[in-house]
Every structure is written in structure tokens, then in C-alpha cells.
């Protein structure tokens, strides 16, 4: 079985500044260094053109990119912004009047970051292994759920009502253009930062 590629929503803003720390391919040209995109005319403005979507594909396996002003701890007392660095592909997509930065990365690379972002390095090896199993299982369940929802279209109802119960699922419908987000809402993912 081929390792799945995970689409992780990192940041959503009117303007996104980032640095390509190696050579990437975008719109048929090789680019690197500091970049800035902004939401304009319903699209993504970059280098004098407006696009509906932009993809920056690394030309080397260990190529990374750094996103500025990534908010972590959303709605927690320790919420703050920081620059984070990621491996893999950077996709920029228009969503709800803003630009969403999505990191496309192999599942095991994603999980390595999740474990190191959520756990203390001094935790026991068995505890870290158990966390990896839980995180992997949860991730694969989210991917399967997203596939099922896309097949159903708008027929998904995030609640179940019986005579004695009303069950409401929160958050599954929150992510429609990526598999999981990078914050505590899903699993904390901070790239290789």
C-alpha cells in the first residue's frame, strides 16, 4: 500500500508571506526565496498575476518552506503567531474570501511532526509509540470520513436525533478543502520547526 499524502491546512489570511528555502516549481518556473501572495479580485495575486490556486512543488526531497505569522493555540490563552517551516508541497487555495495555505506531505512525515509537537521528548518510548498509533488511526479515520462526505455531497447531516437523544458532531464539516488542520482543533502539527 502506498503511503497517503495528507493535506494539512496551516493558515488562512488575506495575505501570506513565506520563504521557499530551496528550489520549487510553480506555474512552470523555478522559484525560491521570499514570496508574498495576497487575496485580490477573488483570486491569489502573485508576481503580477491572479490565480485561483497556486502550487509550489519542491524539486528536492529535503526542500522546505517557511510560513510567517502562523497562529498556534487558536482561542487558547497562549495563542500567538510564529514562523514555521515545513517539508513537502505548498498549495495556496482561495477559500471564503481568503487564501488558505495547505501543506501536502506524506502521512508518516506528518505524524512525526504531530508526535514531536504534542508530546514531551522525555516521555517513555512506549508512551510515544501508543500516541503514534492513536494519531495515525485518528488521521486515517479523518481521511476516510472526508472521502465519504465528498461522495455524499450535501447530504451529510452532522447530527442524529432519536426520541431520547440529540447527538451533534462538531468540526467534521469545518474542513472541506484539506484533510486536517495544523492546530489543536485536529492534531498539533508544526512542521519541522
Feature annotation, model-predicted:
Residues 1-193:
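Conserved, single-site charged/polar hotspot
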Amino acid at each position: 500500500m502506498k503511503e497517503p499524502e495528507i493535506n494539512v491546512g496551516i493558515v488562512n489570511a488575506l495575505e501570506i508571506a513565506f520563504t521557499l528555502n530551496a528550489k520549487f516549481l510553480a506555474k512552470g518556473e523555478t522559484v525560491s526565496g521570499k514570496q508574498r501572495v495576497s487575496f485580490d479580485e477573488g483570486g491569489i495575486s502573485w508576481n503580477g498575476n491572479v490565480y485561483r490556486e497556486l502550487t509550489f512543488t519542491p524539486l528536492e526531497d529535503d526542500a522546505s518552506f517557511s510560513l510567517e505569522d502562523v497562529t498556534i493555540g487558536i482561542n487558547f490563552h497562549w495563542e500567538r503567531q510564529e514562523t514555521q517551516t515545513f517539508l513537502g508541497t505548498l498549495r495556496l487555495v482561495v477559500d471564503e474570501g481568503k487564501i488558505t495555505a495547505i501543506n501536502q506531505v506524506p502521512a508518516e512525515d506528518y505524524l512525526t511532526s504531530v508526535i514531536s509537537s504534542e508530546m514531551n521528548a522525555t516521555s517513555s518510548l512506549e508512551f510515544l509509540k501508543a500516541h503514534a498509533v492513536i494519531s495515525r488511526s485518528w488521521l486515517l479515520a479523518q481521511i476516510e470520513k472526508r472521502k465519504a462526505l465528498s461522495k455524499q455531497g450535501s447530504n451529510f447531516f452532522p447530527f442524529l436525533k432519536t426520541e431520547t437523544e440529540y447527538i451533534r458532531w462538531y468540526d467534521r464539516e469545518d474542513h472541506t478543502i484539506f484533510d486536517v488542520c495544523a492546530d489543536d482543533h485536529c492534531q498539533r502539527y508544526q512542521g519541522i520547526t
